[in-house]
Amino acid sequence: MDNLNDALEKLKLTGTECTSDKLDGCLDCLLQALGHNNTESSEKIQQSGILQLFASILNSQSSCASKVAHIVAEIAKNELMRIPCVEADLIPPLVQLLHSKDQEVLLQTGRALGNICYDNHEGRRTVDQEGGAQIVVDHLRSRCTLTDPSSEKLMTVFCGMLMNYSSENDSLQTQLIQMGVIPILVDLLAVHSQNTALTEMCLVAFGNLAELESSKEQFAATNVAEVIVKLFKKQTEHEKREVIFEVLAPLAENDAIKMQLVEAGLVECLLDIVQQTVNSEKDDDVAELKTSSDLMVLLLLGDESMQKLFEGGKGSVFQRVLSWLPSNNHQLQLAGALAIANFARNDGNCIHMVDSEIVQKLLDLLDRHVEDGNVTVQHAALSALRNLAIPVVNKAKMLSAGVTEEVLKFLPSEMPPVQFKLLGTLRMLIDAQAEAAEQLGKNEKLVERLVEWCEAKDHAGVMGESNRLLSALIRHSKSKDVIRTTVQSGGIKHLVTMATSEHVIMQNEALVALGLIAALELQAAERDLESAKLVEVLHRLLSDERSAPEIKYNSMVLICAVMGSEPLHKEVQKLAFLDVVSKLRSHENKTVAQQASLTEQKFTVQS
């Protein structure tokens, strides 16, 4: 430490006038001290006021510039020294040194700027103002194909500098993307795949940029998928594969890149990893199994990539995924069910899968998770069943297979995601299936649970689906028994509330169901309709200019129907319905205008 003090004193006394040899000796002493104890030595250097002298030496383009840059790089490893480096105006001369032709000067300058920028807003801002990032990007572009060790080392440092400069800063990352850094990084990865340090630095830089939506198009315009999959296939260590996974996940959110990754053979790699890790209990293997199967499911979210892997239901990938359903591994069961749900995004696939008896595999899986089951697996399997039930031709087949009976086993579930999918599955199954709708609609336990969930204000999705299923049971069954069960369970008020929904489709479903109630069982429901203020709601819907034509039409049909009830008729007479309906006779929609004329006639006859 005495040597350090002596060197600092000499530098202070002689400054830039010191001979080159003496200056070199003092700087060597500083480097030695920093290597021995960075924290203490860097603080002593700052306290001595020498940092300002460094700015002068760097500005003078002295032959000692690379050594000074090296010292700054070492000092800036210390978090507390980064702001002092900015305040000593070291960044402008360092950025100027980036124009040097000397490899060592560039290396130490890149290190110094990278370390100053690490988690340091002021440092980044100054480098940005001085145009440092553009110079570094240009260096990488011009040197990309050089494979000598010193060039690769320099490019590794420059990639690290850009990473520290832009990390967790969207505007600086966007700036780098606009400078064209993405194709450069992809080329670096392709050319230097044998260089571990440079490869890892490129991947970390990818990871930073891939999160940005604006980066996805640029990545898609390169051969990034081919390059990364090629690199991925070479990796045998967990840690290195994990770094690549961290890049793949955000990239695979883009549909074009999904397809590129599938074509580059990523799925086969993922399936191999699943096979290697499925029976292992090691933490690393368990984590890698999850990451691989999750990524596999993500690739299936793209329509094009999903169809390519489905291959008309004959694809080897599709068959492998099916084999995950009966597995004893919860993660594979989950991924298998989610994959089926993704394959079931078009009618053709759904029809093929139902004909291939996949429904039974899903029912068997659900049956294993009824008692204290895995909620995520329940949710995924129900999602798959819901999607499979969408095509009309599948509904009867799925009902015959016992899907409703299995789904109803989850009625006691207190988990909103499971409740939501359960409701959606039942609603899809009974669409235009009168017998099934009647059977379910007479199930008091189900209807009571629906009424309970119609009040689940903390879970809008569950509340909305409950209302829709309640309405669907009536609309598709057209059954007096179903209506009576709904009345007894207290469901009428929820259908009236549903008629005021912000979603036109829900409003309409409610009005049609209420119309059937009024036509088939008005007497049984009139008290509930009155206390739910149905007539006021209908008056509001007809008066509101924003109401859709079908809402106005069905509201008028319903008004005509409820006039058969004395108390409801009185409610109608209290409100100025005739004025509202008369105005609708000139409505631009002919069906609405015709119904307005009919309704007006009914009012005239019955008033």
Swiss-Prot record:
GO MF annotation list: GTPase activator activity; guanyl-nucleotide exchange factor activity; small GTPase binding
One of the GO BP terms on file:
positive regulation of GTPase activity
Q: Does the keyword Chloroplast apply?
A: no
Q: Which Pfam families does the record match to this protein?
A: Arm
Where is this protein found?
Answer: Cytoplasm, Cytosol; Endoplasmic reticulum; Mitochondrion
Q: What is its main location?
A: cytoplasm
**Which of UniProt's keywords are assigned here?**
Cytoplasm, Endoplasmic reticulum, GTPase activation, Mitochondrion, Repeat
Which spans of this chain does UniProt mark as ARM repeats? 79-118, 170-211, 347-390, 391-431, 479-519
What are the GO cellular component annotations? cytosol; endoplasmic reticulum; mitochondrion
Q: What is this protein's function?
A: Stimulates GDP/GTP exchange reaction of a group of small GTP-binding proteins (G proteins) including Rap1a/Rap1b, RhoA, RhoB and KRas, by stimulating the dissociation of GDP from and the subsequent binding of GTP to each small G protein.
Instruction: Share what the entry says about its subunit structure, partners included.
Output: Interacts with ralB. Probably interacts with the post-translationally isoprenylated (geranyl-geranylation) forms of ral proteins. Interacts with both GDP-bound and GTP-bound forms of ralA, but interaction is much stronger with ralA-GDP.
The record ties this protein, via PANTHER family, to: RAP1 GTPASE-GDP DISSOCIATION STIMULATOR 1
Protein name in the entry: Rap1 GTPase-GDP dissociation stimulator 1-B
Record organism: Xenopus laevis (African clawed frog)
**Native organism taxonomy:** Eukaryota, Metazoa, Chordata, Craniata, Vertebrata
